[in-house]
């Protein structure tokens, strides 16, 4: 996947887990059927991960900065791998260079991933394009570059959804508008793209520019009365602060909850139990395997019903 061109990647999503449908199959008040189902459940392997959230809706699987355990984060190889593995979305981070080019990278200072001790907004795109964003990860990815948002959109269009986190700066006031312009130009809309930020002001700007995009407020703590914020359609919350009460309060308002960053099966299982809508993960293989096992349980229950 390191070098495969976009045209060799599959169109559309190669894999998606179906919805869990036990709840729709339940018939209220039928005592015998309920008892038989309980007996059948008891006979299944007693794996907590297999018995969670039965009757709910399968959450999305979002690859955090692409498939970042097999390729350098926020690079085209990481995004290609996410596409090939059938992710629902890629979470990526956008910033702007000094000459107005939107690039995909997480840290405002480029030292960690490139060795260059400089801020993104202090460099031109030509300067950013010279940096090696892959060697730190593995010599196999030497000479991998920081991609532009346009390059990422060309790769991902029609193949995977996006969660675009805008990282604003006082030095780049045009970042929101240019990001929206590019998303629209490449056909990303409310069906395949959401926009997130830790800055509520940024979400307000996005809603004014493009009200059609779902916007997510990223919360490190997830405390306080934020449920009714008008410019936040969903909330992206660190897993430690997600509770059943919080999820219920958000759902009652017609909004959703994304959980980050899920790297352990125990945590993923707990998020399923709480009814979280989107699992943002650095370990997508683990999360997809967990959901597949849940799906097998649901399919067995459907077979039993029929």
Question: Where are these predicted regions, by residue range?
Answer:
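Phosphate-group recognition and catalysis centered on beta-loop-alpha active-site segments
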Residues: 6-306
